[in-house]
Amino acid sequence: MRYLTAGESHGPSLTAIIEGIPAGLTLHPADIDHELQRRQGGYGRGARMSIETDRVQISSGVRHGKTTGAPITLTVINKDHQKWLDVMAVGDIEETLKLKRRVKHPRPGHADLVGGIKYHFNDLRDALERSSARETTMRVAVGAVAKRILAELGIDMLHHILIFGGITITIPSKLSFRELQERALHSELSIVNPKQEKEIKTYIDKIKKEGDTIGGIIETIVQGVPAGLGSYVQWDKKLDAKLAQAVLSINAFKGVEFGVGFDMGFQKGSQVMDEITWTPTQGYGRQTNHLGGFEGGMTTGQPLVVKGVMKPIPTLYKPLMSVDIDSHEPYKATVERSDPTALPAAGVIMENVVATVLAKEILETFSSTTMSELQKAFSDYRAYVKQF
C-alpha cells in the first residue's frame, strides 16, 4: 500500500491516490466523510472550517460499494478557492495580479522562509500553500480507507487529549477502552474528563482574545493488534519507528513517545519492563503495558499507546517579528487565517495517520490480493499466536 497527496490550501481541490488496497473491501464515500467531518470539528476551530464542508469524491478503484484492487482516487473540493481565483491561477496572469496576496514576511514556526530559500520562491505563498495543514484533509481521507481495513480485522482505535495548552487532563481510573473512546468522541475537546471542559474552553477563549495559540499532547490507543507485526531484523523494519516518522510528519507535531515514554528516563528497568504471563484461554499477555505495546520494534499483543506533542499553531493574530525578504528590514510576520488551537482536529489526523501505517504493515505482511484472502490469513495468524 502506498499513497500520494496533492493540492494547495486555496487551490481548487485536494487529491490522494492510494495503491495496494485489496479487492472486495466495502467502501462508501460516507465512510470517508465521517472522518473528514471529525477533522473539521472541535472547540477552537476558525473561520475556514465554517466555509468548507469537506466531502470526498471517489473517481476510481471502487465499484458498487466494493474496492476493485485498482488505484483509488479521492478528491475533496476547496470551496474557498472561488475567492482566490487570481491568486491561485494555474496560467500566467498580469504582474499586478501576481502581487495580490504575495507573502514576503515569513511567519516564525512555519515553512515560509526555509521553503522559499530551498525552492527559490520570490513569493512565499508557494511554500505556504502546500505546507498548510489543509493537506491533512487527504491524510485523513486515506486513513479512513485504512480504518475500514482494520475494522474488518477486528482492530479499533481512539485518541484523546492528555495535556491541553498546559492543562493536564485528569483521567478517571479504570476506564475501559470503549469508555475512553465514547467519552472522547462526545467531547468537543477530545478529552475524557467532562469536569474540565468548561475550564479549557474558557482558556481557549482567552487565548483567542489575546491573538495567541496553544498546543498540547495527544494519545492514540489501538486495540486488537496481534503480537509480531514489525521486525527487529533491520532498522527500517521496526514498526514503532515507522509510526514515529508518520506522527512527526503531521503539521506542527514535534515529538512522539510510546507507553510511558520519556518518563522511562526517571525509572529503573524493574519498573518499566512488562512482565510476561500465559493462560490457556488467552495465550501470552503482560502484567502491564509500560512499553506501549512494542518490544524490539514489534507489537507485543498489548494495546498500542502512541503519544504526540503538537506545538502551538505558528500563525498568530498578534504576529511576531520577522524580516521582509525584499529589503531585509524588520517587519511583523504575515497574518493568515488561523485557529487558537487545533488539538481536537490534530487528534483525528494522528489517529488516521496511525491507522494508515498499521494497515500498510498488515497488507505487506499478509497475503492481501482480496479482503477474503487477507481476513483468512490474519485469522490464521491470530490462532497461531494464541497457541504458540
Curated annotation (Swiss-Prot):
Pfam families in the cross-refs: Chorismate_synt
Catalytic activity: 5-O-(1-carboxyvinyl)-3-phosphoshikimate = chorismate + phosphate
Residues binding FMN: 130-132, 251-252, 296, 311-315, 337
EC category name: lyase
Example of a GO MF term: chorismate synthase activity
SUPFAM superfamilies: Chorismate synthase, AroC
Keywords linked to the UniProt accession: Amino-acid biosynthesis, Aromatic amino acid biosynthesis, FAD, Flavoprotein, FMN, Lyase, NADP
EC nos: 4.2.3.5
Gene3D superfamilies: Chorismate synthase AroC
Cofactor dependence: FMNH2
Superkingdom, natural source: Bacteria
Disulfide pairings: none
GO process terms (BP): amino acid biosynthetic process; aromatic amino acid family biosynthetic process; chorismate biosynthetic process
Residues where NADP(+) binds: 39, 45
Similarity section: Belongs to the chorismate synthase family.
Functional description taken from the UniProt entry: This reaction introduces a second double bond into the aromatic ring system.
Assembly behavior: Homotetramer.
Name under which the protein is recorded: Chorismate synthase
Organism: Streptococcus pyogenes serotype M3 (strain ATCC BAA-595 / MGAS315)
